[in-house]
Amino acid sequence: MGYARKVGWVTAGLVIGAGACYCIYRLTRGRKQNKEKMAEGGSGDVDDAGDCSGARYNDWSDDDDDSNESKSIVWYPPWARIGTEAGTRARARARARATRARRAVQKRASPNSDDTILSPQELQKVLCLVEMSEKPYILEAALIALGNNAAYAFNRDIIRDLGGLPIVAKILNTRDPIVKEKALIVLNNLSVNAENQRRLKVYMNQVCDDTITSRLNSSVQLAGLRLLTNMTVTNEYQHMLANSISDFFRLFSAGNEETKLQVLKLLLNLAENPAMTRELLRAQVPSSLGSLFNKKENKEVILKLLVIFENINDNFKWEENEPTQNQFGEGSLFFFLKEFQVCADKVLGIESHHDFLVKVKVGKFMAKLAEHMFPKSQE
Protein backbone atom coordinates (compact mmCIF):
# COMPACT_ATOMS: atom_id res chain seq x y z
CA MET A 1 0.00 0.00 0.00
CA GLY A 2 2.80 2.29 0.94
CA TYR A 3 4.63 1.41 -2.24
CA ALA A 4 1.56 2.12 -4.38
CA ARG A 5 1.06 5.49 -2.70
CA LYS A 6 4.70 6.33 -3.34
CA VAL A 7 4.35 5.42 -7.00
CA GLY A 8 1.21 7.56 -7.17
CA TRP A 9 3.00 10.60 -5.81
CA VAL A 10 5.87 10.11 -8.23
CA THR A 11 3.41 9.81 -11.13
CA ALA A 12 1.57 12.93 -10.01
CA GLY A 13 4.84 14.79 -9.76
CA LEU A 14 5.81 13.78 -13.27
CA VAL A 15 2.43 14.87 -14.62
CA ILE A 16 2.62 18.23 -12.86
CA GLY A 17 6.21 18.73 -14.00
CA ALA A 18 5.31 17.88 -17.56
CA GLY A 19 2.37 20.28 -17.43
CA ALA A 20 4.57 23.07 -16.09
CA CYS A 21 7.18 22.45 -18.78
CA TYR A 22 4.48 22.55 -21.43
CA CYS A 23 3.13 25.84 -20.07
CA ILE A 24 6.60 27.38 -20.08
CA TYR A 25 7.15 26.08 -23.60
CA ARG A 26 3.89 27.60 -24.80
CA LEU A 27 4.67 30.89 -23.08
CA THR A 28 8.17 31.22 -24.50
CA ARG A 29 7.02 30.05 -27.92
CA GLY A 30 4.23 32.61 -27.86
CA ARG A 31 6.64 35.41 -26.97
CA LYS A 32 9.00 34.32 -29.70
CA GLN A 33 6.18 34.33 -32.23
CA ASN A 34 5.09 37.80 -31.10
CA LYS A 35 8.62 39.11 -31.53
CA GLU A 36 8.86 37.54 -34.96
CA LYS A 37 5.57 39.12 -35.94
CA MET A 38 6.76 42.53 -34.78
CA ALA A 39 10.06 42.11 -36.63
CA GLU A 40 8.29 41.03 -39.80
CA GLY A 41 5.54 43.66 -39.56
CA GLY A 42 2.78 41.23 -38.66
CA SER A 43 -0.75 42.43 -39.01
CA GLY A 44 -1.45 42.78 -35.29
CA ASP A 45 -3.94 45.21 -33.82
CA VAL A 46 -2.23 48.29 -35.16
CA ASP A 47 -4.93 49.89 -37.24
CA ASP A 48 -4.51 53.44 -35.99
CA ALA A 49 -5.80 55.65 -38.75
CA GLY A 50 -9.47 55.56 -37.85
CA ASP A 51 -11.84 55.94 -40.76
CA CYS A 52 -9.42 57.94 -42.86
CA SER A 53 -9.73 56.59 -46.38
CA GLY A 54 -6.84 54.39 -47.39
CA ALA A 55 -4.90 55.09 -44.21
CA ARG A 56 -4.84 51.67 -42.62
CA TYR A 57 -1.69 50.88 -40.74
CA ASN A 58 -1.86 47.13 -41.32
CA ASP A 59 -2.24 47.75 -45.05
CA TRP A 60 1.07 49.58 -45.38
CA SER A 61 3.71 47.51 -47.13
CA ASP A 62 6.71 47.94 -49.32
CA ASP A 63 6.94 45.33 -52.06
CA ASP A 64 10.49 46.16 -53.20
CA ASP A 65 12.29 42.88 -53.84
CA ASP A 66 15.70 44.51 -53.52
CA SER A 67 15.47 45.05 -49.78
CA ASN A 68 14.29 42.79 -47.02
CA GLU A 69 14.04 45.61 -44.48
CA SER A 70 11.19 47.34 -46.33
CA LYS A 71 8.58 44.60 -45.99
CA SER A 72 6.21 46.69 -43.92
CA ILE A 73 5.96 49.12 -41.05
CA VAL A 74 7.35 47.72 -37.83
CA TRP A 75 5.42 48.13 -34.61
CA TYR A 76 7.50 49.65 -31.83
CA PRO A 77 7.61 47.61 -28.62
CA PRO A 78 6.95 49.71 -25.51
CA TRP A 79 10.62 49.92 -24.53
CA ALA A 80 11.78 51.21 -27.90
CA ARG A 81 10.91 54.85 -27.17
CA ILE A 82 12.64 55.13 -23.80
CA GLY A 83 14.53 58.42 -24.04
CA THR A 84 17.98 59.34 -22.85
CA GLU A 85 18.89 62.64 -21.24
CA ALA A 86 19.30 64.15 -24.71
CA GLY A 87 15.74 63.20 -25.65
CA THR A 88 16.76 60.52 -28.17
CA ARG A 89 15.70 56.91 -28.21
CA ALA A 90 17.78 54.60 -26.11
CA ARG A 91 17.94 51.69 -28.54
CA ALA A 92 19.83 52.04 -31.80
CA ARG A 93 17.44 49.76 -33.62
CA ALA A 94 14.62 52.25 -33.00
CA ARG A 95 16.26 54.60 -35.49
CA ALA A 96 16.26 51.91 -38.16
CA ARG A 97 12.61 51.16 -37.44
CA ALA A 98 11.75 54.84 -37.70
CA THR A 99 13.47 54.88 -41.09
CA ARG A 100 11.38 51.94 -42.26
CA ALA A 101 8.25 53.64 -40.95
CA ARG A 102 9.10 56.79 -42.89
CA ARG A 103 9.61 54.77 -46.06
CA ALA A 104 6.30 53.04 -45.53
CA VAL A 105 4.49 56.38 -45.12
CA GLN A 106 6.08 57.56 -48.36
CA LYS A 107 5.14 54.33 -50.13
CA ARG A 108 1.60 54.44 -48.78
CA ALA A 109 1.08 58.04 -49.92
CA SER A 110 2.74 57.53 -53.29
CA PRO A 111 2.86 53.79 -54.10
CA ASN A 112 3.82 54.27 -57.75
CA SER A 113 6.55 56.83 -57.27
CA ASP A 114 9.93 57.00 -55.58
CA ASP A 115 9.91 60.80 -55.66
CA THR A 116 9.86 62.61 -52.33
CA ILE A 117 7.60 65.36 -53.71
CA LEU A 118 3.99 64.42 -53.04
CA SER A 119 0.92 65.42 -55.03
CA PRO A 120 -2.01 67.22 -53.32
CA GLN A 121 -3.86 63.89 -53.02
CA GLU A 122 -0.83 62.27 -51.44
CA LEU A 123 -0.34 65.19 -49.07
CA GLN A 124 -3.98 64.82 -48.04
CA LYS A 125 -3.29 61.21 -47.07
CA VAL A 126 -0.28 62.18 -44.97
CA LEU A 127 -2.24 64.96 -43.25
CA CYS A 128 -4.96 62.42 -42.52
CA LEU A 129 -2.38 60.23 -40.79
CA VAL A 130 -1.19 63.16 -38.69
CA GLU A 131 -4.75 64.03 -37.72
CA MET A 132 -5.98 60.53 -36.93
CA SER A 133 -2.97 58.68 -35.57
CA GLU A 134 -1.91 58.58 -31.94
CA LYS A 135 1.16 56.40 -32.46
CA PRO A 136 4.36 58.45 -32.01
CA TYR A 137 6.36 56.62 -34.67
CA ILE A 138 3.57 57.08 -37.26
CA LEU A 139 3.32 60.78 -36.42
CA GLU A 140 7.08 61.17 -36.66
CA ALA A 141 7.27 59.50 -40.06
CA ALA A 142 4.30 61.47 -41.42
CA LEU A 143 5.68 64.79 -40.11
CA ILE A 144 9.05 64.11 -41.72
CA ALA A 145 7.28 63.58 -45.05
CA LEU A 146 5.34 66.83 -44.56
CA GLY A 147 8.43 68.76 -43.54
CA ASN A 148 10.35 67.64 -46.62
CA ASN A 149 7.48 68.68 -48.88
CA ALA A 150 6.94 71.97 -47.05
CA ALA A 151 10.47 72.92 -48.10
CA TYR A 152 9.09 73.50 -51.62
CA ALA A 153 7.33 76.82 -52.18
CA PHE A 154 4.48 75.40 -54.27
CA ASN A 155 3.62 72.87 -51.56
CA ARG A 156 3.26 75.48 -48.80
CA ASP A 157 0.08 76.85 -50.34
CA ILE A 158 -1.25 73.36 -50.97
CA ILE A 159 -0.70 72.21 -47.39
CA ARG A 160 -2.40 75.37 -46.11
CA ASP A 161 -5.38 74.93 -48.44
CA LEU A 162 -5.73 71.32 -47.28
CA GLY A 163 -6.11 72.57 -43.70
CA GLY A 164 -2.65 71.40 -42.71
CA LEU A 165 -1.64 74.33 -40.48
CA PRO A 166 -4.03 73.63 -37.56
CA ILE A 167 -3.54 69.88 -37.97
CA VAL A 168 0.23 70.17 -37.49
CA ALA A 169 -0.07 72.89 -34.83
CA LYS A 170 -2.27 70.59 -32.75
CA ILE A 171 0.72 68.24 -32.42
CA LEU A 172 2.50 70.95 -30.40
CA ASN A 173 0.46 69.79 -27.41
CA THR A 174 2.16 66.39 -27.40
CA ARG A 175 4.57 65.45 -24.64
CA ASP A 176 6.76 63.41 -26.97
CA PRO A 177 9.84 65.59 -27.66
CA ILE A 178 10.71 63.80 -30.90
CA VAL A 179 7.25 64.27 -32.41
CA LYS A 180 7.08 67.86 -31.13
CA GLU A 181 10.39 68.72 -32.76
CA LYS A 182 9.20 67.33 -36.09
CA ALA A 183 5.98 69.38 -35.87
CA LEU A 184 8.00 72.54 -35.21
CA ILE A 185 10.19 71.79 -38.22
CA VAL A 186 7.10 71.46 -40.45
CA LEU A 187 5.71 74.77 -39.18
CA ASN A 188 9.11 76.38 -39.63
CA ASN A 189 9.22 75.36 -43.30
CA LEU A 190 5.65 76.51 -43.81
CA SER A 191 6.25 79.88 -42.12
CA VAL A 192 8.39 81.14 -45.00
CA ASN A 193 5.10 81.88 -46.78
CA ALA A 194 3.56 85.27 -45.87
CA GLU A 195 -0.02 83.99 -45.78
CA ASN A 196 1.05 81.04 -43.66
CA GLN A 197 2.71 83.45 -41.24
CA ARG A 198 -0.53 85.37 -40.90
CA ARG A 199 -2.34 82.18 -39.89
CA LEU A 200 0.46 80.84 -37.72
CA LYS A 201 0.70 83.97 -35.58
CA VAL A 202 -2.03 82.60 -33.27
CA TYR A 203 0.42 79.89 -32.19
CA MET A 204 3.37 82.20 -31.52
CA ASN A 205 2.72 82.61 -27.81
CA GLN A 206 2.47 78.86 -27.32
CA VAL A 207 5.65 78.24 -29.31
CA CYS A 208 7.43 80.97 -27.37
CA ASP A 209 6.39 79.54 -23.98
CA ASP A 210 7.30 76.00 -25.01
CA THR A 211 10.67 77.14 -26.33
CA ILE A 212 11.58 78.97 -23.15
CA THR A 213 10.46 76.18 -20.82
CA SER A 214 11.95 73.31 -22.86
CA ARG A 215 15.08 71.60 -21.64
CA LEU A 216 18.09 73.83 -22.27
CA ASN A 217 19.86 73.17 -25.59
CA SER A 218 17.32 70.49 -26.54
CA SER A 219 16.24 69.82 -30.13
CA VAL A 220 12.75 71.09 -29.28
CA GLN A 221 14.16 74.37 -28.02
CA LEU A 222 16.30 74.88 -31.12
CA ALA A 223 13.39 74.04 -33.43
CA GLY A 224 11.20 76.53 -31.57
CA LEU A 225 13.85 79.25 -31.84
CA ARG A 226 14.14 78.67 -35.58
CA LEU A 227 10.39 78.99 -36.03
CA LEU A 228 10.28 82.21 -33.98
CA THR A 229 13.20 83.57 -36.01
CA ASN A 230 11.30 82.95 -39.24
CA MET A 231 8.18 84.56 -37.81
CA THR A 232 10.13 87.73 -36.92
CA VAL A 233 11.87 88.27 -40.25
CA THR A 234 9.31 91.02 -40.87
CA ASN A 235 8.24 93.58 -38.28
CA GLU A 236 4.58 92.60 -38.32
CA TYR A 237 4.57 90.06 -35.47
CA GLN A 238 7.65 91.05 -33.47
CA HIS A 239 5.62 92.84 -30.81
CA MET A 240 4.17 89.49 -29.74
CA LEU A 241 7.57 88.55 -28.28
CA ALA A 242 8.11 91.78 -26.35
CA ASN A 243 7.43 90.22 -22.95
CA SER A 244 9.81 87.32 -23.61
CA ILE A 245 12.97 89.23 -24.54
CA SER A 246 14.41 88.86 -21.03
CA ASP A 247 13.93 85.10 -21.30
CA PHE A 248 15.76 85.04 -24.62
CA PHE A 249 18.73 86.82 -23.06
CA ARG A 250 18.67 84.23 -20.28
CA LEU A 251 18.75 81.42 -22.85
CA PHE A 252 21.57 83.18 -24.64
CA SER A 253 23.63 83.46 -21.50
CA ALA A 254 23.03 79.88 -20.30
CA GLY A 255 22.91 77.98 -23.59
CA ASN A 256 25.62 76.25 -25.57
CA GLU A 257 27.14 77.72 -28.71
CA GLU A 258 24.38 76.47 -31.03
CA THR A 259 21.65 77.89 -28.78
CA LYS A 260 23.52 81.18 -28.43
CA LEU A 261 23.78 81.64 -32.20
CA GLN A 262 20.11 80.81 -32.75
CA VAL A 263 18.99 83.26 -30.05
CA LEU A 264 21.21 85.93 -31.60
CA LYS A 265 19.49 85.49 -34.98
CA LEU A 266 16.14 86.08 -33.28
CA LEU A 267 17.36 89.10 -31.31
CA LEU A 268 18.96 90.54 -34.43
CA ASN A 269 15.57 90.54 -36.16
CA LEU A 270 14.13 92.49 -33.24
CA ALA A 271 17.08 94.89 -33.05
CA GLU A 272 16.66 95.91 -36.69
CA ASN A 273 13.17 97.23 -35.94
CA PRO A 274 13.26 100.72 -34.36
CA ALA A 275 9.85 100.07 -32.80
CA MET A 276 11.38 97.29 -30.67
CA THR A 277 14.33 99.35 -29.37
CA ARG A 278 12.63 100.40 -26.14
CA GLU A 279 11.48 96.83 -25.46
CA LEU A 280 15.01 95.53 -25.94
CA LEU A 281 16.54 98.15 -23.66
CA ARG A 282 13.90 97.45 -21.01
CA ALA A 283 14.66 93.72 -20.98
CA GLN A 284 16.44 92.30 -17.95
CA VAL A 285 19.77 90.70 -18.82
CA PRO A 286 21.79 88.24 -16.69
CA SER A 287 24.78 89.64 -14.87
CA SER A 288 26.85 86.96 -16.60
CA LEU A 289 26.29 88.62 -19.98
CA GLY A 290 29.46 90.67 -19.56
CA SER A 291 31.55 87.55 -19.04
CA LEU A 292 30.87 86.55 -22.64
CA PHE A 293 33.51 89.06 -23.68
CA ASN A 294 36.45 86.87 -22.79
CA LYS A 295 39.01 85.09 -24.87
CA LYS A 296 37.25 81.74 -24.53
CA GLU A 297 34.01 82.81 -26.20
CA ASN A 298 33.36 82.07 -29.86
CA LYS A 299 34.30 85.02 -32.07
CA GLU A 300 31.13 84.69 -34.15
CA VAL A 301 28.98 84.98 -31.01
CA ILE A 302 30.71 88.19 -29.91
CA LEU A 303 30.55 89.79 -33.36
CA LYS A 304 26.83 89.04 -33.75
CA LEU A 305 26.14 90.40 -30.27
CA LEU A 306 28.00 93.58 -31.15
CA VAL A 307 25.89 93.97 -34.31
CA ILE A 308 22.75 93.77 -32.16
CA PHE A 309 24.12 96.40 -29.80
CA GLU A 310 25.03 98.64 -32.74
CA ASN A 311 21.52 98.39 -34.18
CA ILE A 312 20.01 99.31 -30.82
CA ASN A 313 22.41 102.22 -30.51
CA ASP A 314 21.58 103.46 -34.03
CA ASN A 315 17.83 103.27 -33.39
CA PHE A 316 18.01 104.95 -29.99
CA LYS A 317 17.21 108.67 -29.97
CA TRP A 318 18.70 110.27 -26.89
CA GLU A 319 16.68 113.47 -27.10
CA GLU A 320 13.39 111.56 -27.13
CA ASN A 321 14.34 109.05 -24.46
CA GLU A 322 16.24 111.21 -21.96
CA PRO A 323 13.13 112.12 -19.90
CA THR A 324 12.08 108.47 -19.67
CA GLN A 325 15.37 106.90 -18.60
CA ASN A 326 13.85 106.02 -15.26
CA GLN A 327 11.66 103.50 -17.10
CA PHE A 328 14.71 101.30 -17.59
CA GLY A 329 15.14 99.31 -14.41
CA GLU A 330 18.30 98.19 -12.70
CA GLY A 331 19.73 95.17 -14.47
CA SER A 332 18.18 96.10 -17.81
CA LEU A 333 20.03 96.07 -21.11
CA PHE A 334 20.03 99.88 -20.99
CA PHE A 335 22.18 99.90 -17.85
CA PHE A 336 24.35 97.07 -19.20
CA LEU A 337 25.20 99.17 -22.25
CA LYS A 338 25.79 102.18 -20.05
CA GLU A 339 28.43 100.20 -18.17
CA PHE A 340 29.75 98.44 -21.25
CA GLN A 341 33.04 100.31 -20.93
CA VAL A 342 34.10 97.74 -18.32
CA CYS A 343 33.68 94.90 -20.83
CA ALA A 344 35.37 96.91 -23.55
CA ASP A 345 38.39 97.58 -21.35
CA LYS A 346 38.78 93.84 -20.79
CA VAL A 347 38.74 93.18 -24.52
CA LEU A 348 41.00 96.06 -25.52
CA GLY A 349 43.39 95.71 -22.59
CA ILE A 350 44.45 92.08 -23.13
CA GLU A 351 46.84 91.55 -26.02
CA SER A 352 46.02 87.84 -26.28
CA HIS A 353 42.28 88.46 -26.32
CA HIS A 354 40.63 87.21 -29.53
CA ASP A 355 41.83 88.57 -32.82
CA PHE A 356 42.27 91.96 -34.35
CA LEU A 357 38.76 92.10 -35.84
CA VAL A 358 37.06 91.74 -32.45
CA LYS A 359 39.17 94.51 -30.95
CA VAL A 360 38.39 96.83 -33.85
CA LYS A 361 34.66 96.12 -33.60
CA VAL A 362 34.61 96.71 -29.85
CA GLY A 363 36.57 99.93 -30.19
CA LYS A 364 34.25 101.31 -32.89
CA PHE A 365 31.17 100.36 -30.93
CA MET A 366 32.44 102.09 -27.80
CA ALA A 367 33.06 105.26 -29.80
CA LYS A 368 29.52 105.19 -31.26
CA LEU A 369 28.03 104.41 -27.85
CA ALA A 370 29.77 107.37 -26.23
CA GLU A 371 28.84 109.68 -29.07
CA HIS A 372 25.23 108.70 -29.68
CA MET A 373 23.57 106.86 -26.83
CA PHE A 374 25.48 108.08 -23.79
CA PRO A 375 27.09 111.43 -24.69
CA LYS A 376 29.28 112.64 -21.86
CA SER A 377 27.68 116.06 -21.87
CA GLN A 378 24.35 114.44 -20.97
CA GLU A 379 25.57 112.08 -18.23
UniProtKB/Swiss-Prot annotation:
ARM repeats lie at residues 111-151, 153-192, 233-272. It is found in: Mitochondrion outer membrane; Cytoplasm; Nucleus. Pfam families: Arm_2. The chain crosses the membrane at residues 7-29. Residues 1-6, 26-37 are annotated as: Mitochondrion outer membrane (MOM)-targeting sequence. It comes from the Eukaryota. One of its GO terms (biological process) is mitochondrion organization. Keywords: Cytoplasm, Membrane, Mitochondrion, Mitochondrion outer membrane, Nucleus, Phosphoprotein, Repeat, Signal-anchor, Transmembrane, Transmembrane helix. Residues 1-6 are mitochondrial intermembrane. It is a single-pass membrane protein. InterPro entries: ARM-like (IPR011989), ARM-rpt_dom (IPR006911), ARM-type_fold (IPR016024), Armadillo (IPR000225), Armcx_regulator (IPR051303). One of its GO terms (cellular component) is cytosol. Residues 30-379 are cytoplasmic. Its main location: mitochondrion. The modification Phosphoserine is found at residues 61, 67, 72, 110. Residues 89-98 are annotated as: Nuclear localization signal. PROSITE patterns: ARM_REPEAT (PS50176). Interacts (via ARM domain) with MIRO1, MIRO2 and TRAK2. The interaction with Miro is calcium-dependent. Interacts with SOX10. Belongs to the eutherian X-chromosome-specific Armcx family. Regulates mitochondrial aggregation and transport in axons in living neurons. May link mitochondria to the TRAK2-kinesin motor complex via its interaction with Miro and TRAK2. Mitochondrial distribution and dynamics is regulated through ARMCX3 protein degradation, which is promoted by PCK and negatively regulated by WNT1. Enhances the SOX10-mediated transactivation of the neuronal acetylcholine receptor subunit alpha-3 and beta-4 subunit gene promoters. This is Armadillo repeat-containing X-linked protein 3. The lineage of its organism: Eukaryota, Metazoa, Chordata, Craniata, Vertebrata. The gene is ARMCX3.
